[in-house]
């Protein structure tokens, strides 16, 4: 699912003060909608909602799921949010949901998960180096 990573990176790049989680979520929906045809999934009336069951993010705080942040709350510097769009193909019993955590700053968001391996190639390369 190589198409998954660029849009996750896009959300990390676009997240900024003044935006809402709803706006970030719409970017994910738009990304997936544009790709259903190329994946052969836009058939039998299926839409993004058939493959994407939840929002892109939630605020991260003292609790894993900090409930103080609504989809309409405006992001501010100092907030930490997740970026975990998810995509599921129920009939094939597969799905992907990789979470990055980011810090909203005055400038670009800081990817707090940047050093964690997430692609198949990176994980396999790391595993092959282990004895």
Task: Please describe what each predicted stretch is.
Residues 1-131:
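Active-site neighborhoods and metal-handling regions in enzymes and metal-associated proteins
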């Amino acid at each position: 699912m190589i198409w998954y990573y660029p849009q996750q990176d896009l959300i990390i790049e676009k997240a900024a003060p003044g935006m809402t989680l709803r706006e970030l979520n719409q970017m994910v929906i738009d990304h997936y909608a544009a790709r259903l045809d190329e994946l052969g999934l836009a058939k039998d009336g299926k839409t993004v909602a058939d493959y994407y069951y939840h929002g892109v993010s939630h605020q991260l705080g003292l609790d894993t799921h900090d409930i103080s942040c609504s989809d309409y709350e405006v992001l501010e510097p100092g907030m930490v949010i997740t970026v975990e769009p998810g995509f599921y193909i129920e009939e094939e019993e597969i799905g992907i949901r990789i979470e990055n955590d980011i810090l909203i700053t005055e400038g670009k968001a800081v990817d707090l998960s940047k050093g964690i391996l997430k692609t198949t190639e990176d994980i396999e390369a790391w595993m092959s180096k282990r004895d």
